[in-house]
């Protein structure tokens, strides 16, 4: 009996330390109710639990509420020209040594920066910059794809997704789209295909999850190489990634719901035109619950902190659901407040995660996409392709006069339609 008890205690300690990642025990604080408003229905005695997460949220919340209080009489506005300066400089200078870790994310940086410029103003991506992007990408992959994170690096689904997105923003300048090796990319996608319906992100060492599926389907749609061979088993894989919360995890049956994975799954279902194959009501509930009432922005998982990037990862998922007729599930005005008040800083250009954080290219792009979603309404014809999603300004919400974006692809609507139309006019077989 003592041995069993001992094993149970040891197992509990292991779970608490190794699996739950407790760095210190949960603290209990007794609240003195003598100073509490007796008119409110409260238990005679309550204990408030403290964790690293609750302490971190308290600090963020104090910063956010202070900003809202200080700026309450000021109409929020996007400081476009300030952010443009930050983005333009990236194409003119060598990036500092502390950004060496992004060496394997070169296509991503091109997409984040170029997309941010185009979302703020469709004319802000100059022809000279487009040519620089094209030259860089075809230096990474002289054959025209698939693309790695940099020259000499392994081809990767995420890098190829970012590269195709970046090329779509270049408006086929100098005929650059004809340099894309659609046949080579198609054969590579087939080689990444797994029996369970997923895709490895990299042929040699890649993982398999919902991100890989979304990247593969987005690439294939934009290049007009989507086939039944590519989509076989994908729907079943995605359905099994929706968990009891309503959102989607990375893999079937094993993960908690996460904003990034949920976006990848939702956008993939839109591309497959199979949104009705999942529990949409639970997905709407989960998406709505990610918006924090006090902060007004989104978090990515239950009991996590607000983060500007989820303005698109969760907000974009909600916009896709809205487009397909499932209604609006979050407060767009509140999200707009969070982005404009809390993700901008007067002294530093670019957009950021939350107050106290530094701006970066990643958060600049996804905060801007989230802002575009918050200021728009979405619709589409039943059974229509997701690239035909319609976007109209929401007249009840202020406008930053951003470019209309397609929430499925994270790109301006006109660029999505332009590249898809171009390759649909090119009737050559990808296989």
From Swiss-Prot:
Keywords: Cytoplasm, Metal-binding, Prenyltransferase, Repeat, Transferase, Zinc. Disruption phenotype: Decreases SKT5 farnesylation. SUPFAM superfamilies: Terpenoid cyclases/Protein prenyltransferases (SSF48239). GO terms for molecular function: protein farnesyltransferase activity; zinc ion binding. It comes from the Eukaryota. PFTB repeats lie at residues 130-171, 182-224, 231-273, 280-322, 332-375. (2E,6E)-farnesyl diphosphate binds at residues 258-261, 301-304, 310-313. CDD domains: FTase (cd02893). Zn(2+) binds at residues 307, 309, 363. It catalyses: L-cysteinyl-[protein] + (2E,6E)-farnesyl diphosphate = S-(2E,6E)-farnesyl-L-cysteinyl-[protein] + diphosphate. Changing residue 159 to D/N: Can substitute for PGGT-I beta subunit (CDC43) in vivo. Has increased activity to farnesylate a substrate for PGGT-I. GO terms for biological process: protein farnesylation. Heterodimer of an alpha (RAM2) and a beta (RAM1) subunit. Catalyzes the transfer of a farnesyl moiety from farnesyl diphosphate to a cysteine at the fourth position from the C-terminus of several proteins having the C-terminal sequence Cys-aliphatic-aliphatic-X where X is Ser, Ala, Met, Cys, or Gln. Required for the membrane localization of proteins such as a-factor, Ras proteins and other membrane proteins containing the C-terminal CAAX motif. The beta subunit is responsible for isoprenoid and peptide-binding. Present with 3910 molecules/cell in log phase SD medium. This is Protein farnesyltransferase subunit beta. It comes from Saccharomyces cerevisiae (strain ATCC 204508 / S288c). The gene is RAM1.
